[in-house]
Regions:
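Charge-rich, low-complexity N-terminal segments
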Residues: 1-56
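Short, surface-exposed charged micro-motifs
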Residues: 32, 58-60, 103-105
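Hydrophobic-cavity lipid-handling domains and compact docking modules
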Residues: 41, 45-82
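Short, internal acidic amphipathic alpha-helical interface segments
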Residues: 71-112
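A generic structural motif
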Residues: 74-80, 119-128
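Short, aliphatic-rich beta-strand segments
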Residues: 113-117
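A contiguous, mid-protein "functional segment" used to position or interact
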Residues: 123-160
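Short, highly charged C-terminal tails/helix-capping segments
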Residues: 148-188
Length: 188
């Protein structure tokens, strides 16, 4: 007999339920994606606009004990010249302060600047998912507009950042090369 009194709230976690919910949410938003249920991960093909240009991105959705994280790897730190680093870091710190629901962060292992947000499973409903997902896209759009003034080839550098993250995790996700980076399988 299961004694629920001994189970704390942090131990009640249903990964398949969250994974299935995310599948439905992505279908409702008509997104193209690959799903990796064995490692609780979605890769979503999307794009953001900068001026008249559409920039292809890969949005990563992953699950931790009580959290759903949405993130996009964007800039390898080693791609930013030493002359531009201070101005670039000032930009992302300013954006961290200005933009709600998103945070720029550093993956030290990969030397990658990423943007992310987290949603607690207690509030993981479609409206919140859509709002958090769109917050990432809006923040990226604003980031690219401002970063282009500092680093003119920011979109090329961002593509390298996404590829770097995917390469690190390719053994789990089946590998991606530059040509197939944005050709994800699943369409609703």
């Amino acid at each position: 007999m299961l004694n629920l009194e001994n189970i704390g709230p942090s131990e009640i976690y249903l990964p398949s339920y969250l994974f299935d919910k995310t599948h439905r949410y992505l279908d409702l938003l008509k997104k193209k994606y690959n799903k990796y249920e064995d490692i609780s991960l979605y890769l979503v093909r999307d794009n953001v606009e900068m001026d008249d240009e559409k920039i292809d991105i890969v949005v990563i959705i992953r699950f931790y004990r009580n959290w759903v994280q949405t993130l996009v790897p964007i800039v390898p730190v080693d791609e930013i010249s030493s002359e531009k680093k201070v101005e670039f870091y000032e930009l992302i710190l300013s954006l961290n302060n200005e933009l709600a629901d998103t945070s720029f962060e550093l993956d030290k292992d990969l030397g990658l600047i990423m943007i992310s947000n987290e949603t607690h499973i207690d509030s993981y409903v479609f409206d919140v998912f859509e709002e958090e997902y769109n917050a990432i896209l809006n923040a990226l759009s604003e980031f690219f507009k401002r970063a282009k003034k500092i680093i003119p080839n920011i979109t090329e550098i961002a593509r390298k950042g996404m590829q770097k993250w995917l390469n690190k995790h390719s053994s789990y996700i089946g590998g991606f090369d530059s040509e197939s980076l944005y050709k994800l399988d699943q369409t609703p």
